[in-house]
């Protein structure tokens, strides 16, 4: 991780590196706020960076992952306690935050009405 940050810093320079980090922080804060505004969802912990998870006490998050995948959004499935969905943010996510949140809200509403459950599996990779 340190080597990757150093390489990015070398490529973009200090001003570019700081601008990139401002963009990433904006993406993370917008997404976190949007997720927490959807009834039933909460972000796990108080993440300071761009890799974190969210869960729900009201919805089956594996069903949420299935439904989001049907809309071409792929979330990491965490078979933890509580089960959660994992996001890894990059600058390419900046223009799609609102689209993602719209789809997540629609999926949450549909699952809340239907009681749909999802496949209990993780999608870890090596």
Feature-to-residue mapping (PLM):
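Structural signature of PLP-dependent enzymes
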Residues: 5-29
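Short low-complexity stretches enriched in small and charged residues
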Residues: 7-11, 41-46
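Non-catalytic terminal extensions of PLP-dependent enzymes
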Residues: 18-21, 28-32, 37-39, 46-126
């Amino acid at each position: 991780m340190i080597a990757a940050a150093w390489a990015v810093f070398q490529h973009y320079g200090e001003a570019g590196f700081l601008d990139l980090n401002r963009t990433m922080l904006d993406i993370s804060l917008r997404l976190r706020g949007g997720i927490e505004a959807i009834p039933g969802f909460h972000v796990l912990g108080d993440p300071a960076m761009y890799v974190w998870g969210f869960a729900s006490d009201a919805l089956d998050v594996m069903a949420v992952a299935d439904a989001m995948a049907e809309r071409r959004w792929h979330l990491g499935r965490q078979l933890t306690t509580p089960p959660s969905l994992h996001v890894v943010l990059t600058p390419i996510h900046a223009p799609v935050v609102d689209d993602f949140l719209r789809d997540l809200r629609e999926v949450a509403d549909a699952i809340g009405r239907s009681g749909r459950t999802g496949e209990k599996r993780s999608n870890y990779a090596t």
